[in-house]
Swiss-Prot record:
Keywords: ATP-binding, Chaperone, Nucleotide-binding, Phosphoprotein, Stress response
Source organism per UniProt: Streptococcus sanguinis (strain SK36)
CDD domains, per the entry: ASKHA_NBD_HSP70_DnaK-like (cd10234)
Positions where Phosphothreonine occurs in the chain: T173
Family (UniProt): Belongs to the heat shock protein 70 family.
GO molecular function: ATP binding; ATP-dependent protein folding chaperone; unfolded protein binding
Protein name: Chaperone protein DnaK
Taxonomic lineage of the native organism: Bacteria, Bacillati, Bacillota, Bacilli, Lactobacillales
InterPro entries xrefs: ATPase_NBD (IPR043129), Chaperone_DnaK (IPR012725), Heat_shock_70_CS (IPR018181), HSP70_C_sf (IPR029048), HSP70_peptide-bd_sf (IPR029047), Hsp_70_fam (IPR013126)
PROSITE patterns: HSP70_1, HSP70_2, HSP70_3
Length: 609
């Protein structure tokens, strides 16, 4: 069975891992980094992903960041003169990760386990699965990020039972999960979170502070300047990271804008104390989900054995202190917060292929599911933190006499009124026989699969008529749209491949021209006129093809030049070898003469007096 890669598709950074033997290994990207920025930019028709895209974010307006925050919505992003769905942009990131995983493995990759925040709703999970499909990946499993982290942490600790709390604060989302580990079973007891809280929010607090201070000093509002804002974002992210290791950092942005008197520079010092003050409300928001998860799991703090920190934002000292204060425990530092989720996803891939034995993952649904009933009430069928996969049925009836149809409004959330929860979808069961209200029996069944994706059916128990849908929110893509996007992605991949081949060819041509010119110069006056002239003629022809920008001609002329240059190099080598041999012969004769002279030397004894 082919390898199943594990992918952590993050808001700010992503990572890919694979199982090698019994160990999960992070695959470094082409730049040698173990995580890849979740950034996509477009330039001259080319799609650029990762570190290169992030580097040009300041100057390239066609750069898209933090697309994960838009997953599951109908919002589109404009770039490159087009509009893209969040699924398409995410697919470009996935395609890049898939590409360098294939380079590393030396084989085609078609299957993946992709992680999502535990608190992602159905629409967001479906969007993630669609992104995988567009990227040419069969998504074998969607796994919650804290659960994946627990897998990576606990794989070598199966001999002991323990309850762990996973505190996962990433770039754009926050989750808390409580799991029970023992005998190879990873049982999620409860999960809670906030999909609108992450490292980006901490960056924004610094940006707002810089904008306010600059306006106070110079009377100019930088928040209206797109290029200045991107520079502020980069500086804020760097300052945040610096303050994890030092208590004060200098922010210096020369020529940030211009005033009446000329260019203006932003220079300021940010202390950790000020940063903590700016972000106090964000840190405070992490506490309630911890308490809720513990309450839902029916556990007290004393029953938690370990606290695992996941996500780059857990390096913020104030966050670490808040976790300590809230749990009364020193967090476990045995896992890398940036890599552990992808590693856990790869382990789940190994469970699916059978490479990892005796491991069972029991995850939960993060939010309650139900339907709208009379009076706009939200009636739950499946409570949050129910182990998945699961199925639940309940019988309802009509609200009016002779009602011919019922509308099924499917919702996800925790609020008592339907209007306050997230709509997953609507469908209708028709042709209900005329009867007084309350008589027809309509059975509604919810199914949640192992990926947390919902399907619902409604059945008239009198007529046995049934209506069934897999939930597709207004942000969902049709099969036709996914197919079209897959074709676009394949075409882009082919175009990228051609572009790379073209760049490689141009580099080879430049290298060949340089090397041949050097060899021709070195062989001047050494008697290889025929070979030198042939190499020079081939060199001139290649230069002409280069000027004409004819790629096919360049390829043919490059081969011809390599052949002539090689013939010249052989002559040069032969001459050097002959000279070396002659020199060795001369030295041998000289040494022989020296030995003969040595025969006249008489040995004597030396006595110390």
């Amino acid at each position: 069975m082919s390898k199943i890669i594990g992918i952590d598709l993050g808001t700010t950074n992503s990572a890919v891992a694979v199982l090698e033997g019994t160990e999960s290994k992070i695959i470094a990207n082409p730049e040698g980094n173990r995580t890849t920025p979740s950034v996509v930019s477009f330039k001259n028709g080319e799609i650029i992903v990762g570190d290169a895209a992030k580097r040009q974010a300041v100057t390239n307006p066609d750069t898209i960041i933090s697309i994960k925050s838009k997953m599951g919505t109908s919002e589109k992003v404009a770039a490159n003169g087009k509009e893209y769905t969040p699924q398409e942009i995410s697919a470009m990131i996935l395609q890049y990760l898939k590409g360098y995983a294939e380079e590393y493995l030396g084989e085609k990759v078609t299957k993946a386990v992709i992680t999502v925040p535990a608190y992602f709703n159905d629409a967001q999970r479906q969007a993630t699965k669609d992104a995988g499909k567009i990227a040419g990946l069969e998504v074998e499993r969607i796994v919650n990020e804290p659960t994946a982290a627990a897998l990576a942490y606990g794989l070598d600790k199966q001999d002991k039972e323990e309850k762990i709390l996973v505190f996962d604060l990433g770039g754009g989302t926050f989750d808390v999960s409580i799991l029970e580990l023992g005998d190879g079973v990873f049982d999620v007891l409860a999960t809670a979170g906030d999909n609108k809280l992450g490292g980006d929010d901490f960056d924004q607090k610094i940006i707002d502070h810089m904008v306010a201070e600059f306006k106070k000093e110079n009377g100019i509002d930088l928040s209206n300047d797109k290029m200045a804002l991107q520079r502020l974002k980069d500086a804020a992210e760097k300052a945040k990271k610096d303050l994890s290791g030092v208590t004060s950092t200098q922010i210096s942005l020369p020529f940030i804008t211009a005033g009446d008197a000329g260019p203006l520079h932003l220079e300021m010092t940010l202390t950790r104390a000020k940063f903590d003050d700016l972000t106090r409300d964000l840190v405070e928001r992490t506490k309630e989900p911890v308490r809720r998860a513990l309450s839902d799991a029916g556990l007290s703090l004393s029953e938690i054995d370990e606290v695992i920190l996941v996500g780059g934002s857990t390096r913020i000292p104030a966050v670490v202190e808040a976790v300590k204060a809230e749990t009364g425990k020193e967090p476990n530092k045995s896992v890398n917060p940036d890599e552990v989720v992808a590693m856990g996803a790869a382990i789940q891939g190994g469970v699916i292929t059978g490479d990892v034995k005796d491991v069972v993952l029991l995850d939960v649904t993060p939010l309650s599911l139900g339907i709208e009933t009379m009076g706009g009430v939200f009636t739950k069928l499946i409570d949050r933190n129910t182990t998945i996969p699961t199925s639940k049925s309940q019988v309802f009836s009509t609200a009016a006499d002779n009602q011919p149809a019922v509308d099924i409004h499917v919702l996800q959330g925790e609020r008592p009124m339907a209007a306050d929860n997230k709509t997953l979808g609507r469908f209708q069961l028709t042709d209900i026989p005329a009867a007084p209200r309350g008589i027809p029996q309509i059975e509604v069944t919810f199914d949640i699969d192992k990926n947390g994706i919902v399907s619902v059916k409604a059945k008239d128990l009198g007529t046995q008529k049934e209506q069934h849908i897999v939930i597709q929110s207004n942000s969902g893509l049709t099969d036709e749209e996914i197919d079209r996007m897959m074709k676009d992605a394949e075409a882009n991949a082919e175009a990228d491949k051609k572009r790379k081949e073209e760049v490689d060819l141009r580099n080879e041509v430049d290298q060949a021209i340089f090397a041949t010119e050097k060899t021709i110069k070195e062989t001047e006056g050494k008697g290889f006129d025929a070979e030198r002239n042939a190499a020079q003629a081939a060199l001139d022809e290649l230069k002409k093809a280069q000027e004409d920008n004819n790629l096919d001609d360049m390829k043919a002329k490059l081969e011809a030049l390599n052949e002539k240059a090689q013939a010249l190099a052989v002559k040069l080598y032969e001459q050097a070898a002959a000279a070396q041999q002659a020199q060795a012969g001369a030295e041998g004769a000289e040494n022989a003469g020296s030995t003969k002279a040595d025969d006249d030397v008489v040995d004597g004894e030396f006595t110390e007096k």
